[in-house]
């Protein structure tokens, strides 16, 4: 997993609440376990019409937001069914941080497990970020170490994050990476177990 320290990028305002995982990536795109190529399914029913043509007024289809790396979204983002493809699709599109007032628990966990940073801010700060991202300057800075978001106008917005999750994001550690940090202890345990319970070696 890639470490997340600081992100300076374009922010796209998605002024919709209760976006569920089926809207983030519909079920027809879940037939693969590959993480690459899922961007084509991201917000598919919002981005394309029944004939597969782009819907020009959807935010991520607008030229100024097509390269967005930060998504500013409405409350309760990522609700609905559990699908790890949701953060995969966002990341494959280039979005590495989602800012909202709240996230569904499973989606929130899946984000941290895959290196996508979910940032929770107050309704007032979200409204400010939404409004500013719709202006001529769409650039924001997300600093995980400092736990701040700097808005397009330069306002600094703080956010809270679990310290363990913060450390893992800063170091780029997923569950496997964290386990491998204890490789010496695991090897020692296996050596002792081989002596005390040799029948398990068969």
Curated annotation (Swiss-Prot):
GO terms for molecular function: 3-isopropylmalate dehydratase activity. Pathway: Amino-acid biosynthesis; L-leucine biosynthesis; L-leucine from 3-methyl-2-oxobutanoate: step 2/4. CDD domains: IPMI_Swivel. Its EC number is 4.2.1.33. GO terms for cellular component: 3-isopropylmalate dehydratase complex. It catalyses: (2R,3S)-3-isopropylmalate = (2S)-2-isopropylmalate. Keywords: Amino-acid biosynthesis, Branched-chain amino acid biosynthesis, Leucine biosynthesis, Lyase. It is an enzyme of class 4 (lyase). GO terms for biological process: L-leucine biosynthetic process. The keyword Disulfide bond does not apply. Pfam families: Aconitase_C. Heterodimer of LeuC and LeuD. NCBIfam families: leuD (TIGR00171), PRK01641.1 (NF002458). Catalyzes the isomerization between 2-isopropylmalate and 3-isopropylmalate, via the formation of 2-isopropylmaleate. Belongs to the LeuD family. LeuD type 1 subfamily. This is 3-isopropylmalate dehydratase small subunit. The lineage of its organism: Bacteria, Pseudomonadati, Pseudomonadota, Alphaproteobacteria, Caulobacterales.
